[in-house]
């Protein structure tokens, strides 16, 4: 998700999205550990999106 669509969301929606991203990050990590992750760039993508959401949450306070 790009930054423009994230900025349009409310703080509650961002928090819910952050929870979903954390779950996805856990899933991607487990796939990496077990050797079942075909797209290794997903680790980086999820980590950066979490950073974007946390940045927006911090700036809205």
Swiss-Prot record:
HAMAP family: Ribosomal_uL29 (MF_00374). Keywords: Ribonucleoprotein, Ribosomal protein. CDD domains: Ribosomal_L29_HIP. GO terms for cellular component: cytosolic large ribosomal subunit. The gene is rpmC. Belongs to the universal ribosomal protein uL29 family. This is Large ribosomal subunit protein uL29. It comes from Stenotrophomonas maltophilia (strain K279a). SUPFAM superfamilies: Ribosomal protein L29 (L29p) (SSF46561). GO terms for molecular function: structural constituent of ribosome. PROSITE patterns: RIBOSOMAL_L29. GO terms for biological process: translation. It comes from the Bacteria.
